[in-house]
Amino acid sequence: TKIPVAWTKDYNKIRIYNPAMPEVQTRIMDIVKEIITKYDVDGIHMDDYFYPSLEEGESMNDNAEYEKYGKDKFKSIEEFRRNNVDVVIQNIQKVIIDTKPGVIFSVSPAANIDNNYSKLFADVRKWLKEGWVDVIIPQLYFATGTGKNSFNQFLDQWMQYVNQTHCLIGYGIYKFGSTDPDYGNAFHSSADLKSQFEYASKKSKVNGSVLYSIKDMVANKVGIGTAIKEIYKKKTVIPYLGRTEAKLPSTPVKVRTDGGNLSWEAVPGAYYAVYKSNGEGKLATLVGITRETSFKLPGKGTYCVTALDKANAESRISELVTY
């Protein structure tokens, strides 16, 4: 369907849906509903585009919309703009919950929370407080350091506001090996990516990572693809990112070993993680992930199995068996 021109606004480098128009707000909800109804998607994701980031001398040019839709309800045009974005964010989650609640809603805002609020009119702090977003993925596309606009500074700021919302960190691997002088010397080698991951790994509220982009990973400039392989060398299960407390799958039963093969009874709709015990009170080692109900063990030891469902909710561990 063609987009009515009257529903759009043009700026120097971008054409956007007019955030102030009720017709636009409804259309976005309709699009989301159509996607999750027609297709078996895991989630709906929104990037960092809300109101546009204006160039010098450019105006938002929305006084007419404020006069028509907002002047009687809001004290300022800035408050009006933030509400327009709030309505879309809140309603996307609502239509998902009402239509197909297993679908996840994620947003990846720019790193600077204050700029999101004052320039893009995205009140991310409010969304997190109200629980309107299931997963937040701040784009921390900066080098590590102690100063303003560093990876560390931005991550610390986000950790103040992330509570019930799942948080994944967005890493800007596209900057590594770039000739753009604005990026700085830290991106001339892969070492800073390792530092970024090390810093994020110390934050208990960080649930995982998202890398932008796959093209740059494959290009392997300054060995960034190799560094990523090293960072991800240990197996892991995908975290559960649902908005409600997970309903755990059934625990695998009748776990047994036979000549180095571990087997168990099937759990409907599940895949499985196999762990090796490192002793009481110590973190077990994930040795394999499989959709089969048997697994070739890597060696002698004590093992257990868990079941995971489509949403990656993980069951309690099975009984321990020793081979």
Q: Which residues does each predicted region cover?
A:
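Substrate-binding cleft of secreted/luminal carbohydrate-active enzymes
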Residues: 132-148, 157-158, 163-245
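Short beta-strand segments within Ig-like beta-sandwich modules, predominantly Fibronectin type-III
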Residues: 285-291
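Short proline/glycine-enriched turn/loop motifs at strand-loop junctions of beta-rich domains
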Residues: 266-271, 300-301
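Pro/Thr/Ser/Gly-rich low-complexity, intrinsically disordered linker/stalk tracts
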Residues: 223, 227-268, 312-323
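Extracellular low-complexity, O-glycosylation-prone stalks/linkers
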Residues: 269-285
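Active-site neighborhood of glycoside hydrolase catalytic domains
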Residues: 23-135, 139, 150-164
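Active-site-adjacent "subsite" loops/lids of carbohydrate-active enzymes
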Residues: 1-38
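Beta-strand-rich modules
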Residues: 296-315
